[in-house]
A protein has these predicted regions:
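Short, small-residue-biased leader/transition segments that mark boundaries at the very start
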Residues: 1-8, 13-15
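Extracytoplasmic mature domains of secreted/periplasmic and thylakoid-lumen proteins
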Residues: 16-52
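Acidic, low-complexity proline/glycine-rich segments
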Residues: 38-55, 136-157, 189-194
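Active-site-proximal, well-structured secondary-structure segments within enzyme catalytic domains
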Residues: 52-53, 81-84, 91, 95-136, ...
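Extended, charged alpha-helical coiled-coil/arm scaffolds that mediate oligomerization and mechanical coupling
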Residues: 54-87, 93
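Second-shell loop/turn segments in exported
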Residues: 60-64, 144-145, 171-175, 206-217, ...
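A conserved hydrophobic secondary-structure block that centers on an alpha-helix together
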Residues: 64-78, 165-184, 191-204, 218
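Active-site-adjacent "gating/activation" loops or surface patches in catalytic cores
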Residues: 127-168, 256, 310
Length: 314
């Protein structure tokens, strides 16, 4: 993972919020789009062209083009602050992830883990001039422990550390706490929505989406939950029964991944680790790009020379 300061610079380069806001509030450009929409030429546009024009005009309005000057300025301030808070949230989560680690010197603690995972942990320890293995909250390390580690206490410890990152709970409680950041984001999003004439941020968000209202979204989700719950309950009951057979009468959150993998191996004689060999990154990307080309006629070629915040970026 890149150091936070490098990640921050990269993120700000990718999010030119002030430019986007100024562009969206450019009256001359908006008037030009309106004139085009009212022109005889626009009447002969095909569906795609008309949609692009409609969306452009919509986006101007969602940038506050119709607001009085003072409210336009406030809109710009809120957008800038939201960008800053979004970056701070990501950076604090990254810092919290990197702040926790567990140094292991007894290999039996890692019983059940694949050799590839242990090798990564050994490399992480060596990078810090430590003997043995270093477990971190980076996802490959976390996933390996939660899926394969036989040591239930280790899974619980890691689960608690991972799920409480950047919060007022857990082993690093209060450090890099994102709670206040989230509250500020919620408050500013509400203000932004009201500036643009919406009751709440959910309605503002839906202005650019297919769903017509937040009630429609909630209705869809509730219906999906109603249809899915019986199947999820069945799977959970089977997992609990299997865990009980293996000596775990009370299935906890940090047990689900471990016993789920064990049950999968028992039923299908295959493990996630074994499947990895068939899906190297280059093969996966090649397959994905091939599908895109067949479906949409788009050819994707890799750019070899470019500036990035980390050498692994492609």
């Amino acid at each position: 993972t890149a150091p936070t300061e490098i990640y921050t610079l990269s993120l700000h380069d990718a999010l030119p919020i002030s430019y986007s806001t100024e562009l969206g509030q450019n009256r001359a450009l908006f008037d030009a789009y309106q004139a085009l929409a009212a022109s005889p030429e626009a009447a002969s546009f095909d569906v795609a062209q008309k949609t692009i024009l409609e969306h452009a005009l919509r986006d101007f309005r969602l940038s506050g083009i119709d607001l009085p000057a003072a409210e336009q300025q406030r809109y710009a301030e809120v957008q800038s602050k939201l960008s800053e808070l979004g970056s701070r949230f990501s950076n604090q989560l990254l810092d919290a992830t990197q702040a926790w680690s567990k140094h292991v010197t007894d290999e039996t603690t890692l019983d059940g883990l694949p050799d590839s995972a242990k090798a990564q942990m050994a490399a992480a320890a060596a990078a810090k001039d430590l003997e043995g293995w270093l477990i971190t909250l980076e996802f490959p390390s976390y996933y390996a422990v939660m899926t394969y580690a036989s040591d239930r206490a280790l899974r619980e410890e890691l689960y608690a550390a991972y799920c409480t990152r950047a919060s007022d709970q857990g082993p690093n409680a209060g450090q890099f706490d994102n709670g206040p950041v989230m509250q500020q984001i919620l408050d500013l999003r509400q203000e932004l929505a009201e500036l643009l004439g919406y009751k709440n941020y959910a309605e503002l968000s839906l202005a650019t989406k297919m769903a017509e209202s937040s009630d429609q979204v909630l209705s869809f989700l509730r219906d999906l939950a109603k249809r899915s719950k019986p199947f999820a309950a069945r799977d959970l009951a089977q997992l609990k029964a299997y865990a009980a057979e293996q000596g775990c009468p009370e299935l906890a959150s940090w047990d689900a991944g471990y016993f789920g993998e064990k049950l999968r191996e028992q039923r299908y004689s295959v493990s996630q680790e074994a499947l990895r060999a068939y899906f190297p990154i280059d093969k996966v990307l090649g397959g994905l790009f091939s599908i895109v080309q067949r479906l949409y006629g788009i050819e994707i070629n890799e750019l070899k020379q470019f500036d990035a915040w980390h050498p692994d970026v492609r």
